[in-house]
Regions:
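A detector of single, family-specific signature residues
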Residues: 1-191
Length: 191
């Protein structure tokens, strides 16, 4: 009580807790949370690269990226060169065509299966299981990141910060800067 009375008697100009301050705290929490999730996903992607190198090293030379949706779908169902080499070509082609929205065709499935048949990759059921689970975790993290980004976008749409009008300033960068700096009017000068 004494502290409150002293504070009220002193001539301190107290600012009320505004919606902007609330949104800033929310934005700060969300951008930091998103950053952590992206870092976590990056580590898992490194694990996928390591596991593919063990199980089917030739795959990286056959596709533009092993981290695409279609390759994840393929590896989720056939997590290794041995499994791919034994798969029916029509099934492989269907997975690739469907998940790549036509980017990959039957000829790509044929190339991948042929490479799998002559692969130097190890046949390791434990690593294959780890690969499947790691891909599931990446997909779940991607879903969570998208949900976080939707929440960030909602706050940014409410705030309509002028920082977004800066050429080259992306949505994520603007949100992170705004979250960490807060209200720019709190600064007397640019220095």
């Amino acid at each position: 009580a004494r502290t409150i009375a002293t504070m009220l008697l002193s001539d301190v100009d107290l600012k009320s807790y505004t919606d902007t301050a609330y949104h800033n705290e929310e934005l700060k929490s969300l951008t930091r949370y998103r950053f952590d999730k992206v870092q976590e996903r990056a580590k898992l992607k490194q694990s996928v690269s390591r596991l593919v190198t063990i199980l089917f090293p030739e795959l990286e030379q056959l596709v533009s990226s092993i981290h695409g949706t279609s390759i994840y779908a393929l590896l989720s169902e056939y997590p290794g060169a041995k499994q791919i080499s034994e798969a029916h070509l029509t099934r492989l082609a269907n997975i690739l065509v469907k998940t790549s929205r036509g980017h990959y065709r039957k000829d790509k499935a044929t190339h991948i299966r042929d490479a799998a048949r002559t692969s130097i990759g190890s046949v390791t059921p434990a690593k294959s299981l780890e690969l499947k689970h790691t891909i599931k975790l990446i997909q779940e993290l991607t879903s969570e990141i998208n949900e976080i980004e939707d929440a960030i976008r909602k706050i940014m749409d409410e705030l309509k910060p002028p920082i977004l009008s800066i050429p080259g300033m992306g949505f994520h960068s603007a949100a992170m800067i705004l979250a960490e700096v807060g209200d720019f009017s709190n600064f007397n000068s640019p220095d």
